[in-house]
Amino acid sequence: QGEAVQDKAEGSVYSTGNTGSGTVGSNTGNSKTEENITDNSPPSSEGLKYETIATANGSYIKIVGYEGHSANVLVPAFIHDIPVTYIAGGAFKNNDVIRTITFEGADDLSKRQFYLPASSNCAPAVFYNLPNLTKITFPYELSCGRYLADYSLYSYNESWRYLFEGTPKLAAIETTSKPSKADTASRRYAYMTSKDGVLYSSYLDGLYFYPYAKKDKSFTVPYETLYVFINDCFYLEELRINATPSHYFDFNILPSNTHLKKVIAEGGKPFETRYWTDGDVLFSRQESTTANPKAVSVAYYPQTKNDKAYRLPDIPEGYYYNIINQFNLNTYIEELYVPARAKVWAGMTEKSYRPPNLRAIHLQEGNPMSQSDIDDFTRHGVNIDYNY
C-alpha cells in the first residue's frame, strides 16, 4: 500500500490500481522506434508517479512523473477516491513513445478542480520534449488558478506556450464535455474549452493556444473571441477575424511565428468598420465618437512581408495614424513613407521597437514630428526627410 508519510505519500499508478512507494520500473523503453509503437492501444495509467498531499481542507494528488511505456496515457480524475488536482512541471518529459495524453474529467465539479502551472517559472515545462505527442485531452475543469479568473489574460500567452515546449507534432488540444453554464457562471474565465483542436476560455472569449502542428493554412477566429494568442504555428498562413467585433482584439503573435502572412478582417471597409485589411496589413479604427480626429492604428504588419519600403495609405480628413509601432518584427523594411496626419512613435528610436534594418522615414510636409524626435532618429541611424 505504499509507505505512510504524515504529510505526503509517493506512489505509482498501475492499471490494476495497486500502489507502491518510490519509482516502479525504469525508463527503458522510452526510445522505442515508431515501428514498435501501437498508436491505437487502449489508454493506460501504468507508470504514473504521484504525490498525495494532505491539507486542512482534505487530501489531493499531484502528478509528478511518468515512467510507463504506453503510446496513449490516461490520467484518472481520482486515485483511491482522492482527486487528482495538480500536475507538476516535467511530469511528462523526454519520451518519444507517447502519442496522446488524456486527463479524465470529473462528473461533479464540486469534487475537484484541475490546475496546470501556467508559469514560465515552472521548470521544466509540464509537457517537455515529447516529439511524437499529437493530442492532449484536458478535463473541462482545467484551470490555471485565480490569474485566469480575473480576466487578466494578455500576459499568459508565453505561459501557455511554455507548457508545451518541445512538442512539434502537437496538432490538437481537446476538452471533455463541459458542465452547464449554471455550473460555471461564477468562474466563467477560469475554465477552458476546445473547438476544432484549439484551446479557449470556457465561453470562447480568449484563444489561448493554437497547436503547433495544426495543419489548417487558414483559421477563422470565432466572433466571441477577443484575445488572440498565436504561437509558432508551422502551417498557419492566414488568420481571419470579424471586422466588427464587440470589443477590440488583443493580439499577441509571437516574433518567432514566421509563417503567418496576413490577418484578414472579413467584411472590413477602410475607416468604416473597426478593422479592415489593406493588402496584407491590418488596420483598426478607434470607435470613440468623441475623438476628433479619430485615431487609426496599424494593428498587424506581417513579419513575412518582404517589401523594402512601405507607404501608409492616404488617410481622409478627420482621421490620423496614431503611434506607428507595428513594424519592429519585420526584417525586410528599410523605408517608411508617412503622411502628414500621422504620429510616429518616438520610442521607435529604440532598437527593440523599430524594424532592425530601417534606415529612412519619409514624411509628408506638415507631419508633426518634433525636431528632438528627428534628432533622436538621426542619432540612431534613421534618416528623416520630407520626400514623401
What is the meaning of each model-derived region?
Residues 1-2, 6, 88, 292:
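Short, intrinsically disordered, low-complexity terminal segments
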